[in-house]
Amino acid sequence: VDDTQAHQPQEAHEPDEAHEPDRPCPAHAGSTGSGAPRHYLTTTIPYVNSRPHLGFALELVQADVLARHHRRLGHRVRLLTGTDENSLKNVLAAESLGVPVRELVDRNADAFAALHGPLSLSPDDFLRTSSDPRHRPGVERLWRACAANGDLYRKHYAGLYCVGCEQFWSEEELDGGRCPEHGTEPHLVVEENWFFRLSRYAERLHALVTSGRLRVEPEARRNEVLAFIASGLRDFPVSRSRERARGWGVPVPDDPGQVVYVWWDALGNYITALDYATDGAAYRTWWEGGDRRVHHVGKGVVRFHAVHWPAILLSAGLPLPTDVLVHGYLTADGRKISKSAGGGAADPVELVGRYGTDAVRWWLLREVPRTGDVDFTEERLAARYDTDLANGVGNLVSRTVAMVHRYRDGAVPQAPLPDCAAVAACGEVAVQVSEALDAFDLRRATGAVLRVVEEANRYVESVRPWELARAEGGGDRRAGGRLDESLAVLVHCCRTLGRELAPFLPDGAARIAARCAGSTLAPPVPLFPRLSGPGGGG
């Protein structure tokens, strides 16, 4: 695979793009044009020792929602994802399979890039650390900048290393002598490496996180970072011997016997993808000139992103991220879903094949709490889809369209909207979604959208359009006017759902918008067919 051809960076999404469903929406307050806020959003980059699992799909979908939301506000957005290919665990995985490392990383990197279609993701760039020509020179430049600041030095070291998470652990950090992330016993590594003077930055990092200039959400993760800093920061190794790395990775500048430690290499992707090596226009626009630089990360790597990475940037004299948004883990039977666990239930592409993109995205956004982990089962996925989308959103839209056809031959009444709870919910939802997403609370954001469904259903049961139609048929002209009003309210609610669901369910939202567009509606068709149980649904 020639990565320079397979994954060319796209132009970042600009606010005047007209593609559905991320176009700027008048219902949301937001700047447009060249002076619009610039949001640079990133995911972590996964190791490619195996194929993707549902746990990483969670992070991709969350970041995609934020990107689509900001585009809809008229903001300029660049969303980066990619793959972390210069790790020892990739080398060991290739050895265990008896294949060249290049063959393994190419094959699995393609599998990660292929998630974008099934999950309806909208990244602007995809960087592969082993083959993208932007990456290595950027890593080298970052190394030299920290060296020039006096923050890199060599020393002999002995430490307990977990290959699974590619990091050293102190004995106090281990859980019964095992890695707290992987449950495996780390092995002793003794060699001479380059170290970074992390201890030099403890006070500055503490001040940045405490003040909110480096925002870590949710609060529990911020407190965890502050406690880690307060416990005393130790300098950490940033290289490994070329021999232990099997010759795979980025050589340390001016020291060919050492390879850059995978975490330094991987963290650098956030700026190397912007042509940091050459001070490119993308770097100046999105990192130096960006209004927000947002990292989406899992809880297991928050220290690297909220402590190690900012310290490296401080050393190099570069701008820091503005936000580190931290999610929990997906578990299966109480155990973290990971590539090593295997199993089809953890494969996002297989899940999409069985249940559809809307079902998978919705479960990840609706079920996962702001803080903590959640256990995944296919039964829970199907039940959540049926409850919220088939019986909720889909049923409301289908019911509304059917009544417009039954009572008005498909023509949407042009009646003024009354002062009622359903209309009020439509007017409030945009702000509620924005506030929830700004707090990185996707469950609250999706709940705000579902409130429109709840109020619309209450409205239907209150006004009972079928009784108004019966009265109109008996000659009651006032009932006919109220029927027009009620149908106008319900169509308004459905159109609001099509708009507000767009960041969360781009495919489903587009179907709703198309079904409810225009002055005359097309006949009803199921938008979210039920996955299980009896009955129809939307």
What is the meaning of each model-derived region?
Residues 1-7, 20-38, 78, 82, ...:
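Basic, alpha-helical terminal appendages of large translation-related enzymes
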Residues 119-127, 147-160, 172-173, 187-189, ...:
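Short secondary-structure capping/junction motifs at helix and strand boundaries
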Residues 2-3, 25-152, 163-166:
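N-terminal Rossmann-like or analogous alpha/beta NTP/dinucleotide-binding catalytic cores
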